[in-house]
Amino acid sequence: MFPGWLALTLLSVACLGTQDFNEELKKCFEDPQYEDLLQLARNGIGQTSVKKKIIVIGAGMAGLTAAKILHDAGHQVTVLEASGRVGGRIETHRVAGVTWFIELGAMRIPISHNLTQEFVKRSGLDLQEFYSNNDQTWMLFNGVRHQLGDVKANPDRLGYSVRDDEKNKTADQLFKQSLRKIEKELTNCKCSCRQVLEKYDSFSTKEYLIKVGNLSRGAVQMIGDLLNADSGYYEAFMETLRAYIIFGESRFDEITGGFDQLPQALSDALCPGTVKLHSLAESVEMSGDCVHVTYRTSDPLQPRARLTADFVLVATTAKAARLLRFQPPLSLDKQDALRSIHYTSASKVVLACTRRFWEDDSIFGGKSSTDGPARFIYYPNQRFSGDKGVILASYTLDDDSTFMAALDRDRIVEVVLDDLAAVHNRSKEELRALCPYSNVKHWGLDPYSMGGVAFFTPYQYMDYAQELSRPEGRVYFAGEHVDLPHGWIDTAIKSGLKAAKSIQEAVNLASTENPEHTKEHSS
């Protein structure tokens, strides 16, 4: 996840009760297939009458989900994973011999993401609440430092230059105010969701807030700073709106003991040897009713191997898919979609500390924020034995992440310690002594994902959303970039379920149209 990860999360919006949000607008972003897919996740697709060989490229949540469904249906499945672990953009950082851990990728699950919760439950894992907001945390903007609770009570404390009609409103309230025109179009003009989505697909987030939302530049800056939107203001407004609606959920959860347990449980549920790690797929050759996949192995005496299957599912990121050599080449439209879709950058900086110094401020969970390079600081919801603690000392996206990625690790830690000291009003040297261990993850530099999560720029929804999910002959595609909303484990799972269902439908259709040929080929 970001995956979808990660949860990967796209905005850090202050809590907005979903009951306060326009229900018609929320419905525009609901997937009409979702409940059917939830039943598929629970019951599977049944036993296939014709067993096929299927290769899945990529052992992230999309690939593992599809592999599990197809495996349970009776197909012979092989999963090729280029890296040395499963999970993709689910990555839990652990250190041998210690009990603490922290998420470098996906780290939260919205309460409405029932598919993810279903797979967590079926894997025998537990959930606990992830606290996104805490009134005791700090906000440091424009040289002014206040606790979140004080800013909620008086948003003008932060000193943004806004119009009189925008004063004493939170960034969240200002963003919601900008949506009035869309809400009116849905309710008064009887515009369809598709009409609204098509109309506003051309707007960047900043363009919409100024031209349609009629907000002042000061209000736009406030939204960008506090809601983590400024570094991606050039991205599509409809993506920002999708993220805003999700972050209005009443509750988020995390997997007790670490998110990496989920993909590992899916992998363990497959037959031994199904998932091949350190197996980088290089080429996909379609020939008649067969698909041949050539991949690298870890065996120096046989550096490359070849598998033949009836179907192939490409469950990598769009960027990683471009490294595959397809023969015959993919359609020009597919190539354009894979090449053009925008990915966010995302960076996380982890500090492990001998003492949970943030608890001196009565901070347990939640996040602090600043306009400094560190941007967002997340405090752990899980407590480990003793006084030790681990903190996500910086979480940045888009241009903020690119800034971090240009620095070497030591310089990054120095920059983050500067911001952490300012936010907590402590000396940098004290924090350096308290937090001697660090780790840095740049998803934009990851050689396997090659990016954080997909996030459309203007026009990309209309241009690429359907094309990204369209199969090419016997080659299918899955991943959080293939479905909506981008950047979530749930979306990766959803795309994997849809792909598995489509492959099974193709098997059924072939067996109906040409039963003798199907029977012979499947042997």
Annotate each predicted stretch with a short phrase.
Residues 50-79:
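N-terminal Rossmann-like FAD-binding beta1-loop-alpha1 element of flavoenzymes
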Residues 71-96:
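Glycine-rich FAD pyrophosphate-binding loop
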